[in-house]
């Protein structure tokens, strides 16, 4: 095994050979420039950045669809959108938000930040990382292309059978949905496997499991949840595709199938997905609160255990969505208990944050404002969640706008607000520029006001009986005034998000130079330049506490690992529990094979919509691409 050493003899950059060694590292870890070379990048920061930017674009597109639906619903018997187009917009909005925005952007944040936070130079499988992004991008582009050519799915983002079956949805749109959902989840699974391997085996020496940043813990829990939650929805979408294309009748009662099987498979994924989205946001909140209170998080162990508990308990909630399907009430009672029980670890998180904030001199910068807004919105969403966990109450409000209100309070308040706080927080690290505080405060104010103006009145609509998933309603129902008010609120909410997008855009060129650690934070990503070099760290740091930067500043010294080659893409491997140095792994260089493999797999998946023979074509093309990917190369061919 190659030997590495730990030294603490002052700043390495002060040595005479530092410039030459840095230049060698720059050449070794270079990401090729140019448009064609864009398809060969494997660096984790570039791939993570692409995930984040692409997800935000899909978020904006889903928002536009939502505004169009609100315009349709702002007055009774409106004819702006017909029922078919409304159903397409509704399906595309939900599918985009759940599959193309929420999970990918959380994975993208993990891909970008986790290697920096744990003190390593790249992900465990860089080419697999790139492959996952190209799969995700291809699926998203094809799904939105289906909308523009009139082939979009229209049976809802949940694709309930028999409505999503061939008999009631004969159009090709649902074939597109079933195929692309399976395809998209390949991307999610590749990222999850990579993140687990990277976190367990590439932490800097000394970063034992009980010293990991809470965001890294959150990403680890999220990754394991993805590994267990995504296969059921992939199985369900494949079975539905076989029903539609080969008349297999898994969900057709006349053929011996069972429609409720779809709901069991889908919601076994669907409810954990809410927490797949939420758990990384909880980690973001902890990192931001630590920085802006200038104190370690209160109850670190309790915070970690509550994250793990959320991951476990979330898999026992799927029948929470099926209280009105006729299942035995004795069985439903257990899911009511589980639905109430998951509030306990969530409450532990909130009380630990409050304890950290209590008595602190808080800096009320924009990231912190988004976190404080989260507290108010998420608590409301959590309270209504406990309400719909009660079977008698759920029977009354199921499939009404009360559930729409609850759902959006939890996901926008619980995930999107912390996410935008995290974007303001880590934007200086990614770009080297600070975002405008003035625009950030205005954006937060509009988002917070617009969110409440849009979704709080929906509780009342639901209690008055307005069903969700309808494209119009009669004037005599008396829902017109509230819907008009909600539509106005939706445009205020959209203006808030648009202001943040504008802030991101102009700050790239007009923002103040950030420096390496503008927030005076404590975690390792702030020990690098902004933006970091392609290799992240000139020397791998040694971690001695949960707040390494603060403690190194107090001790006025910093221990570093030496011995890794500057001429090869080497990373340090450490033990799983205590992060003791164990070995060195040589990573592959940039290549176009992940992009070509993604295209080959896409041809097989998308082509099968029109002919089974495309699967054969995609299979053989994928085989040749994998051979090219894995073909051994001599050292000079890796340059």
Which role does the model predict for each range below?
Residues 2-639:
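Membrane-embedded and interfacial regions of multi-pass energy-transducing membrane proteins
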């Amino acid at each position: 095994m190659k030997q590495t050493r730990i030294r603490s003899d002052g700043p390495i950059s002060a040595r005479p050979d530092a410039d030459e060694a840095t230049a060698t590292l720059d050449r070794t870890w270079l990401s090729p420039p140019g448009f064609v070379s864009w398809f060969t990048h494997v660096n984790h920061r570039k791939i993570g950045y692409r995930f984040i930017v692409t997800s935000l674009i899909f978020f904006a597109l889903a928002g536009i669809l939502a505004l169009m639906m609100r315009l349709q619903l702002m007055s009774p018997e409106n004819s702006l959108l017909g029922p078919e187009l409304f159903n397409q917009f509704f399906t595309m909005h939900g599918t985009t938000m759940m599959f193309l925005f929420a999970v990918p952007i959380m994975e993208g944040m993990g891909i970008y930040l986790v290697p920096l936070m744990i003190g390593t130079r790249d992900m465990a499988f860089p080419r697999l990382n790139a492959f996952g992004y190209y799969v995700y991008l291809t699926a998203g582009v094809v799904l939105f292309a289906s909308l523009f050519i009139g082939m979009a799915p229209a049976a809802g983002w949940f694709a309930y059978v028999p409505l999503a079956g061939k008999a009631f949805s004969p159009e090709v749109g649902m074939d597109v949905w079933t195929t692309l959902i399976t395809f998209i989840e390949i991307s999610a699974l590749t990222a999850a496997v990579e993140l687990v391997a990277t976190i367990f085996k590439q932490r800097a020496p000394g970063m034992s499991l009980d010293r990991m940043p809470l965001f890294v813990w959150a990403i680890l829990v999220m990754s394991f949840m993805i590994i267990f939650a995504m296969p059921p929805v992939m199985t369900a979408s494949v079975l539905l595709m076989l029903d539609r294309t080969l008349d297999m009748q898994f969900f057709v009662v006349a053929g011996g199938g069972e429609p409720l099987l779809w709901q069991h498979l889908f919601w076994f994924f669907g409810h954990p997905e809410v927490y797949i989205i939420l758990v990384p946001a909880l980690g973001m909140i902890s990192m931001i609160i630590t920085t802006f209170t200038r104190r370690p998080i209160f109850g670190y162990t309790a915070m970690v255990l509550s994250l793990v508990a959320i991951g476990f308990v979330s898999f026992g909630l799927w029948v929470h969505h099926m209280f009105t399907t006729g299942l035995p009430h004795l069985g439903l009672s257990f899911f009511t208990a589980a639905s109430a029980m998951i509030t306990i670890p969530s409450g532990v998180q909130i009380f630990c944050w409050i304890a950290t904030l209590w008595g602190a001199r808080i800096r009320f910068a924009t990231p912190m404002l988004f976190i404080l807004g989260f507290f108010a919105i998420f608590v409301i969403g959590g309270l209504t969640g406990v309400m719909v966990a009660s079977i008698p109450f759920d029977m009354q409000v199921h499939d009404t706008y009360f559930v729409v209100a609850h759902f959006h309070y939890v996901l926008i308040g619980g995930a999107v607000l912390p996410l935008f706080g995290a974007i303001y927080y880590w934007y200086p690290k990614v770009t080297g520029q600070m975002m405008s505080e003035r625009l950030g405060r205005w954006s937060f104010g509009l988002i917070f006001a617009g969110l409440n103006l849009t979704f709080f009145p929906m509780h009342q609509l639901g209690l008055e009986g307005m069903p969700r998933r309808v494209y119009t309603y009669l004037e005599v129902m008396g829902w017109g005034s509230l819907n008009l008010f909600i539509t106005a609120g939706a445009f205020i909410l959209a203006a808030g998000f648009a202001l943040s997008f504008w802030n991101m855009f102009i700050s790239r060129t007009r923002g103040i130079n950030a420096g390496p650690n503008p927030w005076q934070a404590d975690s390792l990503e702030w020990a690098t330049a902004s933006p970091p070099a392609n290799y992240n760290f000139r020397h791998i740091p040694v971690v001695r506490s949960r707040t390494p930067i603060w403690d190194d500043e107090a001790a006025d010294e910093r221990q570093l690992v030496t011995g890794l080659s500057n001429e090869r893409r080497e990373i340090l491997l450490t033990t799983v529990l205590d992060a003791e140095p164990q070995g060195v792994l040589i990573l592959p260089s940039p290549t176009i094979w992940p992009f070509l493999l993604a295209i080959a797999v896409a041809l097989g998946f998308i082509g099968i919509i029109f002919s089974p023979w495309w699967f054969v074509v995609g299979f053989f093309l994928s085989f040749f691409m994998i051979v090219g990917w894995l073909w051994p190369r001599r050292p000079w061919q890796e340059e």
